[in-house]
Swiss-Prot record:
It catalyses: tRNA(Glu) + L-glutamate + ATP = L-glutamyl-tRNA(Glu) + AMP + diphosphate. This is Glutamate--tRNA ligase. It comes from Leuconostoc mesenteroides subsp. mesenteroides (strain ATCC 8293 / DSM 20343 / BCRC 11652 / CCM 1803 / JCM 6124 / NCDO 523 / NBRC 100496 / NCIMB 8023 / NCTC 12954 / NRRL B-1118 / 37Y). It is an enzyme of class 6 (ligase). Catalyzes the attachment of glutamate to tRNA(Glu) in a two-step reaction: glutamate is first activated by ATP to form Glu-AMP and then transferred to the acceptor end of tRNA(Glu). GO terms for cellular component: cytosol.
Length: 498
């Protein structure tokens, strides 16, 4: 592309970073960086009643955690600021263009009460008409309309400002993702509000003013914004401005239910911060989210953010709904943890501290031992770092209960023979025995007693760890304190084999 690329991610600070919003931010970032453009963050905080205290901070922190950077934002202002809509409104930026539309007759003040609007909707439903706003100044001159304004103001009524929708107009654009789209003016529901009674601009008006003044060239956003686009094009045309290129990305749906992701669906984690707290890796989150509605060439599925940037092609954005597959996310995260376990190790150790398996001071002193424990336990079987806690809890920090099934293994004829042989040979081994030494000892017991398989391994594991499954036993034994293991064996022997 030869034109100057300027794209934006414009969240509302009404909540934390949702997976869908993260995808919007990631694709806009990729588009900007691939074409050496500018990535802008603008905060759309006009809905003060719904804004939460740390909404903006959370959004920016989680974007940074994902590895995204930006060129302009509230915390990195450029020449097109302010970058919060509330601040832009205070400066009168929107009012200037509201006044221009009022002066040209393309907008007007409406004083209808909520009761009047409800009555109109009921009448339209009774007449089986599509819901639409009924223009109240039909046939009046400008002077007569102004007189009506004064009359309503005298009654203490506060107006909203509505845009006068051209009735027969068709709004068309060539969507970057969906191709050619046409929507008739009649489909937008009649004259719509561009300024609320409290003086705040509505979303579809403010976003146009901001995108124009910030010189946004491309607008990449979710499919649910398609219905907003004709309203926005109306404002561009009414003010004589060039319309940016729009691209509407496919909806993200729940892979199990097939329904659009809903923030009210508590059965599926949908916020980046939730995955961060569980120990998902930022590279994995970007990797997974980047494949929701975009497909690379070839069969590979594991990509870094920089690799995405190099191969990004907006033409490969999909029209089909993107399935949020929790199992796929777990697999992707596991791939990233296995790719560089040493890099994830501090986080894995911290999980053990957080779970109170070990104190922070002891963790610092035993860092090498903990690293070996985690490597023996293996990250292959976990989807995120918090799961390491249960993987290593037994037998490295706690002993589980011996079940009836385990007792049967121990007290069988073969079990008693194996337990006795294992206790005596283990005690004779040096404290610095290697995995090979332990394996050789177990093989010798197998050959001497002619017992193998579960009848061999289960009694040994039960005597040593109170478990019948777990990490590689010879490797694990090198990490367990010998005196502790001997005490465990003697306790088992006294309780079940005496």
């Amino acid at each position: 592309m030869t034109e100057d690329i300027r794209v934006r991610y414009a969240p509302s600070p009404t909540g934390h970073l949702h997976i869908g919003n993260a995808r919007t931010a990631i694709f806009n970032w990729l588009f900007a960086r691939h074409y050496n453009g500018t990535f802008v963050i603008r905060i759309e905080d006009t809905d003060s009643a719904r804004n939460i205290a740390d909404g903006e901070k959370s959004q920016l922190e989680n974007l940074a955690w994902l590895g995204l950077d930006w060129d302009e934002s509230p915390d990195k202002p450029g020449v097109y600021g302010p970058y919060r809509q509330s601040e832009r409104n205070e400066q009168g930026i929107y009012q200037e263009f509201i006044d221009a539309l009022l002066a040209s007759g393309q907008a007007y003040k409406s004083y209808k009460t909520s009761g009047q609007l409800a009555s109109e909707r009921e009448a339209q439903q009774a007449a089986k008409q599509a819901p639409h706003y009924v223009y109240e100044y039909e046939g009046l001159t400008n002077e007569e309309r102004e007189a009506k304004y004064a009359e309503f103001e005298a009654q203490g009524l506060k107006p909203v400002v509505r845009f006068r929708v051209p009735e027969e107009q068709v709004y068309a654009w060539d969507d970057i993702v969906k191709g050619h789209i046409e929507i008739g003016a009649k489909e937008v529901g009649g004259d719509w509000v561009i300024q609320k009674a409290d003086g705040m601009p509505t979303y579809n008006f403010a976003v146009v003013v901001d995108d124009h003044l910030m010189k946004i060239s491309h607008v990449l956003r979710g499919d649910d914004h398609v219905s907003n686009t004709p309203k926005q094009i109306m404002i561009y045309e009414a003010l004589g401005w060039d319309v940016p290129k729009f691209g509407h990305m496919a909806l993200i749906i729940n892979g199990e239910t097939g329904k659009k992701l809903s923030k009210r669906d508590e059965n599926l984690l949908q916020f980046v911060e939730q995955y961060k707290e569980l120990g998902y890796q930022p590279q994995a989150m970007v990797n997974f989210i980047g494949l929701l509605g975009w497909s690379p060439k070839g069969e590979d599925e594991i990509f870094s953010l920089s690799e995405f940037k190099e191969m990004f092609d907006e033409k490969r954005l999909s029209k089909a709904n993107a399935k949020f597959d929790q199992k796929k996310l777990e697999w992707v995260n596991n791939q990233w943890m296995r790719r560089d376990t040493d890099a994830v190790m501090p986080q894995l150790i911290q999980e053990l501290v957080n779970a109170h398996l070990i104190s922070a001071d002891d963790a610092a002193d035993k860092k090498k031992w903990l690293s070996e424990v985690i490597k023996v336990a293996g990250v292959d079987g976990i989807s995120y770092t918090r799961q390491i806690v249960e993987l290593v809890r037994k037998p490295f920090f706690e002993l589980g209960d011996i079940t009836d099934e385990m007792v049967e293994y121990l007290t069988s004829e073969d079990g008693r023979k194996v337990a006795a042989a294992w206790e005596s040979t283990y005690e004779s081994l040096p404290t610095d025995a290697t995995p090979a030494d332990y394996m050789s000892t177990i093989r010798a017991i197998q050959n001497d007693l002619e017992i193998k398989g579960r009848n061999l391994w289960n009694p040994i594991r039960i005597m040593t760890t109170h478990e019948v499954q777990g990490p590689n036993l010879p490797e694990m034994l090198t990490l367990l304190d010998k005196n502790t293991v001997l005490k465990t064996m003697r306790d088992v022997k006294e309780k079940y084999l005496a």
